[in-house]
Amino acid sequence: MTENINAGIPLGKQVGHSETYDPSHLFPVARREARKSLGLADDLPFSGPDIWNAYELSWLDSKGKPCVALGEITFPCTSENIIESKSLKLYLNSFNLTRFTSTARVKEIIREDLSRVAGAEVEVKILTPEEFTEVTISAPEGSCIDDLELEEEINAYRPTANYLSTGPEETEEELYTNLLRTNCPVTGQPDWATVIINYRGKAIDQRGLLRYIISFRQHEGFHENCVERIFMDILNRCAPARLTVYARFTRRGGLDINPYRTTHAEHFVNLRLARQ
């Protein structure tokens, strides 16, 4: 992130809260800035969404009675911008003392505002309390690599793609780890995630993959940028025929962000994990 971009970001700063609906809180961050460092242009080698879950969504009905809901917001990775997370929190909080005629109206306003700022069509789903039972805790289906013994001591925590390698045998498998930690590029605060990697191709060395994910522990980057870096490093180093990288980050400020990147047709599930 360049300094001039960080200058306008509300994250880590004292920012006033609006008592009523205020879309001016929304702050865009251009995707192209981080993608330049990965050598990515407009012709992306992946597709997929960023799935945001909003757990603190509330507004007033036409008589002033509070309503609560869960929100699911899906941004395409082809959007011009991501939305800075604190700005989205402030935006959603501005609904708290604003009256709306219906849940459908709230959904439409959020969809219109986020689509405008992101620069692409955004999907919004709102779950009312009667639908909360639809949200259940799940787990990845693949093999967890967290208990593998690493042969060498870890002394540095910076992304190192050279840890990634493959063997001669072909396989199709899903691997996951709960050990990803990255850091906010603005505040330096840690972000935690489970990373699910599904691929077909030459078998990825699992110890090397685990060491690679651990190497992000002091890396600074937004969630979306970190996942795209992981995706591109695996794609470039291991050359799978098919690859999907899906990260489920823990929530902050009532929001969690879950980037999904794939080389093939999108078929994703909003897979809520225990730490979320």
Curated annotation (Swiss-Prot):
<keyword id="KW-0671">Queuosine biosynthesis</keyword>
<comment type="function">
    <text>Catalyzes the NADPH-dependent reduction of 7-cyano-7-deazaguanine (preQ0) to 7-aminomethyl-7-deazaguanine (preQ1).</text>
</comment>
<feature type="active site" description="Proton donor">
    <location>
        <position position="191"/>
    </location>
</feature>
<dbReference type="GO" id="GO:0005737">
    <property type="term" value="C:cytoplasm"/>
</dbReference>
<feature type="binding site">
    <location>
        <begin position="85"/>
        <end position="86"/>
    </location>
    <ligand>
        <name>NADPH</name>
    </ligand>
</feature>
<comment type="subunit">
    <text>Homodimer.</text>
</comment>
<keyword id="KW-0560">Oxidoreductase</keyword>
<feature type="binding site">
    <location>
        <begin position="252"/>
        <end position="253"/>
    </location>
    <ligand>
        <name>NADPH</name>
    </ligand>
</feature>
<dbReference type="GO" id="GO:0033739">
    <property type="term" value="F:preQ1 synthase activity"/>
</dbReference>
<protein>
    <recommendedName>
        <fullName>NADPH-dependent 7-cyano-7-deazaguanine reductase</fullName>
        <ecNumber>1.7.1.13</ecNumber>
    </recommendedName>
</protein>
<dbReference type="Pfam" id="PF14489">
    <property type="entry name" value="QueF"/>
</dbReference>
<comment type="pathway">
    <text>tRNA modification; tRNA-queuosine biosynthesis.</text>
</comment>
<comment type="similarity">
    <text>Belongs to the GTP cyclohydrolase I family. QueF type 2 subfamily.</text>
</comment>
<feature type="binding site">
    <location>
        <begin position="83"/>
        <end position="85"/>
    </location>
    <ligand>
        <name>substrate</name>
    </ligand>
</feature>
<dbReference type="InterPro" id="IPR016428">
    <property type="entry name" value="QueF_type2"/>
</dbReference>
<dbReference type="InterPro" id="IPR043133">
    <property type="entry name" value="GTP-CH-I_C/QueF"/>
</dbReference>
<feature type="active site" description="Thioimide intermediate">
    <location>
        <position position="184"/>
    </location>
</feature>
<dbReference type="InterPro" id="IPR029500">
    <property type="entry name" value="QueF"/>
</dbReference>
<feature type="binding site">
    <location>
        <begin position="223"/>
        <end position="224"/>
    </location>
    <ligand>
        <name>substrate</name>
    </ligand>
</feature>
<dbReference type="InterPro" id="IPR029139">
    <property type="entry name" value="QueF_N"/>
</dbReference>
<keyword id="KW-0521">NADP</keyword>
<keyword id="KW-0963">Cytoplasm</keyword>
<dbReference type="InterPro" id="IPR050084">
    <property type="entry name" value="NADPH_dep_7-cyano-7-deazaG_red"/>
</dbReference>
<dbReference type="GO" id="GO:0008616">
    <property type="term" value="P:queuosine biosynthetic process"/>
</dbReference>
<dbReference type="Pfam" id="PF14819">
    <property type="entry name" value="QueF_N"/>
</dbReference>
